[in-house]
Amino acid sequence: MIVVTGAAGFIGSNLVRGLNRRGIQDIIAVDDLTDGDKFRNLVDCSIADYLDKDEFRERVRGGNLPALRAVLHQGACSDTTERNGRYMLDNNYRVTLELFEYCQAERVPFLYASSAAVYGGSSVYVEDPANEHPLNVYGYSKLLFDQVLRTRMDSLTAQVVGLRYFNVYGPHEQHKGRMASVAFHNMNQFLAEGHVRLFAGWDGYEDGGQSRDFISVEDVVAVNLHFLDNPDQSGVFNCGTGRAQPFNDVAAAVVNTLRAERGEAALPLAELVKKGLLRYIPFPDDLKGRYQSYTQADVSRLRATGFSAPMRDVQTGVSEYVRYWRALK
């Protein structure tokens, strides 16, 4: 049996599908369906059981779980604007610690979601404490358990892997609201208004030139399954493409994919701007000095574990995502 926490969420539901594609259905899905609409993310999944997150936590504390093959822990509060540190540390740190201790006692592989938010204002995205300066309590809640793992690396009884997700986009993120990916928001904005708005240039970057390491959720699933297949590998690893691309690339991929749906030709960036399909708004004063204009994962440690699969660039991954979303309409 494999446990997937956050199973009705964005990455968790895609992991369940990834396991299903391998023929694995002995899955315990764990989540909080207070937001009942999230059930839609599990409708086409095959699972053995569903547990509410509070019941699951009690079962972990009581040792009342069946024999497990692995725990894929994706459940967390991922709202980077959440200010309630007490809630965040219990939900993101303490629950992770309890699961870790259970898995170590039972010798069960434990893969968990960390975050690139641990780097905060750093300009170097290498898994090293010198680069880790979270700017919010969300990032700190993730860093705190990464630090625990580092202190326990020499005494592990079973695999433990923390994956620092960068800017993930893809199917089944619609419930995340403002925390959904820029690709999701660009797509909905273009469909509603006929154009996409991006920040104008600032801090040495041209209009729409601020860049992120955007990674398709399909590649995130592939990385998780790689570690599931290699239980001898443990540690904290960046989970990005190793490629920074500007927001302009995301917007262009969204607009041109939707234009193709209408039988219209793809346009270069300059033409998209000229036709008013891509517009720039002044960079907000309240974000100046507090905004990451560039992120790019160093994936050397990830690649050193034997993960050799190519990762989608924005043009490929975002186009796939838009076509998937439109096929549902």
From Swiss-Prot:
<feature type="binding site">
    <location>
        <begin position="199"/>
        <end position="202"/>
    </location>
    <ligand>
        <name>substrate</name>
    </ligand>
</feature>
<feature type="active site" description="Proton acceptor">
    <location>
        <position position="176"/>
    </location>
</feature>
<feature type="binding site">
    <location>
        <position position="291"/>
    </location>
    <ligand>
        <name>substrate</name>
    </ligand>
</feature>
<feature type="binding site">
    <location>
        <position position="176"/>
    </location>
    <ligand>
        <name>NADP(+)</name>
    </ligand>
</feature>
<keyword id="KW-0413">Isomerase</keyword>
<comment type="function">
    <text>Catalyzes the interconversion between ADP-D-glycero-beta-D-manno-heptose and ADP-L-glycero-beta-D-manno-heptose via an epimerization at carbon 6 of the heptose.</text>
</comment>
<protein>
    <recommendedName>
        <fullName>ADP-L-glycero-D-manno-heptose-6-epimerase</fullName>
        <ecNumber>5.1.3.20</ecNumber>
    </recommendedName>
</protein>
<feature type="binding site">
    <location>
        <position position="168"/>
    </location>
    <ligand>
        <name>NADP(+)</name>
    </ligand>
</feature>
<comment type="pathway">
    <text>Bacterial outer membrane biogenesis; LPS core biosynthesis.</text>
</comment>
<dbReference type="GO" id="GO:0050661">
    <property type="term" value="F:NADP binding"/>
</dbReference>
<comment type="subunit">
    <text>Homopentamer.</text>
</comment>
<feature type="binding site">
    <location>
        <position position="212"/>
    </location>
    <ligand>
        <name>substrate</name>
    </ligand>
</feature>
<feature type="binding site">
    <location>
        <position position="142"/>
    </location>
    <ligand>
        <name>NADP(+)</name>
    </ligand>
</feature>
<comment type="similarity">
    <text>Belongs to the NAD(P)-dependent epimerase/dehydratase family. HldD subfamily.</text>
</comment>
<feature type="binding site">
    <location>
        <position position="38"/>
    </location>
    <ligand>
        <name>NADP(+)</name>
    </ligand>
</feature>
<feature type="binding site">
    <location>
        <position position="178"/>
    </location>
    <ligand>
        <name>substrate</name>
    </ligand>
</feature>
<dbReference type="GO" id="GO:0009244">
    <property type="term" value="P:lipopolysaccharide core region biosynthetic process"/>
</dbReference>
<dbReference type="GO" id="GO:0097171">
    <property type="term" value="P:ADP-L-glycero-beta-D-manno-heptose biosynthetic process"/>
</dbReference>
<dbReference type="GO" id="GO:0008712">
    <property type="term" value="F:ADP-glyceromanno-heptose 6-epimerase activity"/>
</dbReference>
<keyword id="KW-0119">Carbohydrate metabolism</keyword>
<feature type="binding site">
    <location>
        <begin position="31"/>
        <end position="32"/>
    </location>
    <ligand>
        <name>NADP(+)</name>
    </ligand>
</feature>
<feature type="binding site">
    <location>
        <begin position="10"/>
        <end position="11"/>
    </location>
    <ligand>
        <name>NADP(+)</name>
    </ligand>
</feature>
<dbReference type="InterPro" id="IPR001509">
    <property type="entry name" value="Epimerase_deHydtase"/>
</dbReference>
<feature type="binding site">
    <location>
        <position position="167"/>
    </location>
    <ligand>
        <name>substrate</name>
    </ligand>
</feature>
<feature type="binding site">
    <location>
        <begin position="74"/>
        <end position="78"/>
    </location>
    <ligand>
        <name>NADP(+)</name>
    </ligand>
</feature>
<feature type="binding site">
    <location>
        <position position="185"/>
    </location>
    <ligand>
        <name>substrate</name>
    </ligand>
</feature>
<keyword id="KW-0521">NADP</keyword>
<feature type="binding site">
    <location>
        <position position="53"/>
    </location>
    <ligand>
        <name>NADP(+)</name>
    </ligand>
</feature>
<dbReference type="Pfam" id="PF01370">
    <property type="entry name" value="Epimerase"/>
</dbReference>
<comment type="pathway">
    <text>Nucleotide-sugar biosynthesis; ADP-L-glycero-beta-D-manno-heptose biosynthesis; ADP-L-glycero-beta-D-manno-heptose from D-glycero-beta-D-manno-heptose 7-phosphate: step 4/4.</text>
</comment>
<dbReference type="InterPro" id="IPR011912">
    <property type="entry name" value="Heptose_epim"/>
</dbReference>
<feature type="binding site">
    <location>
        <position position="91"/>
    </location>
    <ligand>
        <name>NADP(+)</name>
    </ligand>
</feature>
<feature type="active site" description="Proton acceptor">
    <location>
        <position position="138"/>
    </location>
</feature>
<dbReference type="InterPro" id="IPR036291">
    <property type="entry name" value="NAD(P)-bd_dom_sf"/>
</dbReference>
